[in-house]
Amino acid sequence: MSEAGEEQPMETTGATENGHEAVPEASRGRGWTGAAAGAGGATAAPPSGNQNGAEGDQINASKNEEDAGKMFVGGLSWDTSKKDLKDYFTKFGEVVDCTIKMDPNTGRSRGFGFILFKDAASVEKVLDQKEHRLDGRVIDPKKAMAMKKDPVKKIFVGGLNPESPTEEKIREYFGEFGEIEAIELPMDPKLNKRRGFVFITFKEEEPVKKVLEKKFHTVSGSKCEIKVAQPKEVYQQQQYGSGGRGNRNRGNRGSGGGGGGGGQSQSWNQGYGNYWNQGYGYQQGYGPGYGGYDYSPYGYYGYGPGYDYSQGSTNYGKSQRRGGHQNNYKPY
């Protein structure tokens, strides 16, 4: 078990004005949020409450439930194993389950995991300790708390011809799915023209589910792509959870380069990317798995298999960083 002295990166994406980010339906539902941290070192016994199942089963089964004995542990070395993690925390109390989240593509640790104590008092003991070190790294344990998400009623529609369809045509098409509360048609302030995307808010959540049954829709001859829209703050957190997966094979939209986008023209990509930098955006890919978790100090929102600490930048308009650990891990 080798030491990993380098920090594993976290980075926030830029979004400022009136912003909503468009994300896939998978992110909706319940989440989790993390609270303050603590320290230690130890040796362990097998998890007594998990003898009939694989490690992590109890944690996974209760992912949408409050559990006073559950902790999130961030900042782990890629070399730290589940046994190492369990051995360390056993000195604070009986550990009934333990898991480290792995990237299914690389088989490598994503640098964070979960501990489930039999007794909630063990969590307080962990938090009472000021610093925790494991495998040469300062780690950051936090309480795991369930957090219910608001119903999603707003969608992003990208790939539209800015000249058409008209607002009336957009309302006519999407009104078939349910009652529309509002339609936003963002403008290019320099050209004083519409951009190639809109936001639609329905009065209920059900129409959003219906619209998302198809990824692409054709409105007045324009093939458009549909995503769930949500506030930029949530989107920024979500970026680190489902990770670089959203951009992994995409170009730098903000600079008008590359990127798929379902056949949209480069000029649309360019305009869309510029507007994203003002507070709008959307992410294509999504790790399934643990969508809906929100460890907000770390931004592990919706941590799906695509997350990797080495996937530094995840927003369109910035180049990706790949490779090993980097010294800009910023949990707060």
UniProtKB/Swiss-Prot annotation:
GO biological process: cellular response to amino acid stimulus; chromosomal 5-methylcytosine DNA demethylation pathway; epithelial to mesenchymal transition; mRNA modification; negative regulation of nuclear-transcribed mRNA catabolic process, nonsense-mediated decay; positive regulation of DNA-templated transcription; regulation of gene expression; regulation of intracellular mRNA localization
Record's keyword annotation contains Acetylation: yes
Residue span(s) of domain RRM: 69-154, 153-233
Pfam family, one: CBFNT
Record PTM: Dimethylation at Arg-322 is probably asymmetric.
Tissue: Ubiquitous.
Chain spans, region Disordered: 1-66, 235-268, 311-332
CDD domains referenced in this protein's UniProt entry, alphabetically: RRM1_hnRNPAB (cd12757)
This protein's name: Heterogeneous nuclear ribonucleoprotein A/B
Originating gene: HNRNPAB
